[in-house]
Swiss-Prot record:
Transmembrane segments: none annotated. One of its GO terms (molecular function) is ATP binding. With CysN forms the ATP sulfurylase (ATPS) that catalyzes the adenylation of sulfate producing adenosine 5'-phosphosulfate (APS) and diphosphate, the first enzymatic step in sulfur assimilation pathway. APS synthesis involves the formation of a high-energy phosphoric-sulfuric acid anhydride bond driven by GTP hydrolysis by CysN coupled to ATP hydrolysis by CysD. One of its GO terms (biological process) is hydrogen sulfide biosynthetic process. This is Sulfate adenylyltransferase subunit 2. Pfam families: PAPS_reduct. Residues 281-300 are annotated as: Disordered. It comes from Brucella canis (strain ATCC 23365 / NCTC 10854 / RM-666).
Length: 300
């Protein structure tokens, strides 16, 4: 038997996880946020069940504040790959006018993402949900299992999780409970980019450097993606050469100065990077809005 490369081992582990969930859960779903990790997850899911399509739908929780290029890419991928795409919006949040500019990152994220996700999981009665989180991203994710148990309220209790020895997973849940499943847990950001390069996986163009209209605000370069973003006194829109390491709601996602215009350039950039990709996410900036608190409330 030939020795597997590092990326082949990661790929094999992820495919095993996909198949384990398909075999043991009655109604799984994949959370499709449209970022680079979701693109890798989609690719792995297609591989895991080829030539059949993935035996589960793909769910996008739309906050109505995603980059326009993300939504265009999402719809194009669904048409091209032929997977079942479910889009859920927290309509009550929309009626209440919840948004990142009017209510801040914490309230917006909780209402439009966390509550929206809980609504969708309850509506369709999913008992397992794939997510693209990785342990290298953030400290609370570093201690999360691949099969992350959630209670009937979708909450995560890090003290009430199950051992995962020898890649044997406990998939039993009672009525109303569910499991969040993270096939990319052991991948790093560099692994993701090297795999995207190796497999030639399509990704949102925002990951590549280009001249974009940005405003420097609260220590971040925020892209002006539509007319809902109002300038503060003294702010000016500049066309700067930037790209994004992570994607989310555009008012809460900071760009980085970069000239990496192709996948090889991005991999080279990652080899010397000394900061986390999460530095560009406003929702991780303070303790009150910490990732662990959000996950306990039912966040991804």
């Amino acid at each position: 038997m030939k020795n597997l490369t590092h990326l082949q081992r990661l790929e094999a582990e992820a495919i095993h996880v996909f198949r384990e969930v398909a075999a043991t859960f009655s109604n799984p779903v994949m959370l499709y946020s449209v970022g680079k990790d979701s693109s890798v997850m989609l690719h792995l899911a297609m591989k895991a069940f080829y030539p059949a399509p993935p035996p589960f739908p793909f769910l996008h929780v739309d906050t109505t504040w995603k980059f326009r290029e993300m939504i265009e890419f999402r719809d194009a991928q669904a048409r091209e790959k032929g997977f079942e795409l479910l889009v859920h919006v927290n309509e009550q949040g929309v009626r209440d006018g919840i948004g990142p500019f009017t209510h801040g990152s914490n309230v917006h994220t909780h209402i439009m993402k966390t509550v929206g996700l809980r609504q969708a999981l309850d509506k369709y009665r999913f008992d397992a949900a794939f997510g693209g989180a990785r342990r290298d991203e953030e400290k609370s994710r570093a201690k999360e299992r691949i099969f992350s148990f959630r209670n009937a309220q979708h909450g995560w209790d890090p003290k009430n999780q199950r051992p995962e020895m020898w890649k044997i997973y406990n998939t039993r849940v009672s009525k109303g409970e569910s499991i969040r499943v993270f096939p990319l847990s052991n991948w790093t950001e560099l692994d993701i980019w090297q795999y995207i390069l190796q497999e030639n996986i399509p990704i949102v163009p925002l990951y590549f450097a280009a001249r974009r209209p940005v405003v420097e605000r609260d220590g971040m370069l925020i892209m002006v993606d539509d007319d809902r973003m109002k300038l503060r006194p003294g702010e000016q829109v500049e066309n700067r050469l930037v790209r994004f390491r992570t994607l989310g709601c555009y008012p809460l996602t900071g760009a980085i100065p970069s000239s990496a215009a192709n996948l090889s350039d991005i991999v080279e950039e990652m080899l010397i990077a000394r900061t986390s990709e999460r530095q560009g996410r406003a929702i991780d900036r303070d303790e009150a809005g910490s990732m662990e608190k959000k996950k306990r409330e039912g966040y991804f």
